[in-house]
From Swiss-Prot:
One of its GO terms (cellular component) is Holliday junction helicase complex. The keyword Transit peptide does not apply. Residues 65-142 are annotated as: Domain II. It comes from the Bacteria. The gene is ruvA. InterPro entries: DNA_helicase_Holl-junc_RuvA_I (IPR013849), Hlx-hairpin-Hlx_DNA-bd_motif (IPR003583), NA-bd_OB-fold (IPR012340), RuvA (IPR000085), RuvA_2-like (IPR010994), RuvA_C (IPR011114), RuvA_C_sf (IPR036267). Residues 143-154 are annotated as: Flexible linker. This is Holliday junction branch migration complex subunit RuvA. The keyword DNA damage applies. Residues 155-206 are annotated as: Domain III. GO terms for molecular function: ATP binding; four-way junction DNA binding; four-way junction helicase activity. Transmembrane segments: none annotated.
Length: 206
């Protein structure tokens, strides 16, 4: 069982990333809560991991901290929620997901790609009691430091393209992704992660 990886971040294209450890590249899927806090490429990264095995595949999932991983594991215990759907659900801020569940907010939950009314209802029923004592930890990046901007800012077109690609990978239609990104695009935004976060908040108001 692989519980944690420490290495250099060599691929960062939501929801996929790769960590190089002594010349071996580990492919992982990660929720947006992790991508928001990743360092720049080639920097050292520490990720807590979950190894999911099914009849047809084996997949590593990476998380900034153990609390994110714990929340992911809570999600996949819900009837009908698999690991990839859990990653999609965690495109919402953890605080927002918890609040939606505790407040029975079906309307927000069903806006997540792949989550229908029945799945949203199961999330609320099966997780509500478990989340009543949930504590959210302060945001830090994957090196253990406070979140900081990348030193080399990509072009605005590249940021927009990366944000749209990430939303499509999360299950949104290309037209939906393009419109959502266009609504929140600003010259002041210098990271695709920030643009994705704003677009998701606009698409899934909690």
């Amino acid at each position: 069982m692989i519980g944690r990886l420490t290495g250099n971040l060599v691929v960062k294209q939501a929801p996929n990333l790769m960590v190089d450890i002594n010349g071996v590249g580990y492919d992982l899927l990660a929720p947006m809560s992790t991508f928001y806090q990743l360092p720049e490429l080639d920097a050292k990264v520490v990720l807590h991991t979950h190894f999911a095995v099914s009849e047809t595949s084996q997949q590593l999932f990476g998380f900034i901290d153990q609390q994110d991983r714990e929340f992911f594991r809570m999600l996949i215990k819900v009837n009908g929620v698999g690991p990839k759907m859990a990653v999609g659900i965690m495109s919402m801020e953890t605080n927002d997901i918890v609040r939606c569940i505790l407040e029975d907010n079906l309307n927000a939950l069903v806006k997540v790609p792949g989550v229908g009314k029945k799945t949203a209802e199961r999330l609320i029923i099966e997780m509500r009691d478990k989340l009543k004592s949930w504590q959210v930890t302060p945001s830090v990046d994957a090196t253990g430091s406070l979140v900081a901007l990348d030193s080399a800012a990509p072009s605005q077109n590249a940021i927009v393209a990366e944000a749209e690609s990430a939303l499509v990978a999360l299950g949104y239609k290309p037209v939906e992704a393009s419109k959502a990104v266009a609504r929140v695009t600003s010259d002041e935004i210098t990271r695709s992660e920030d643009l994705i976060r704003l677009a998701l908040r606009n698409m899934i108001p909690a």
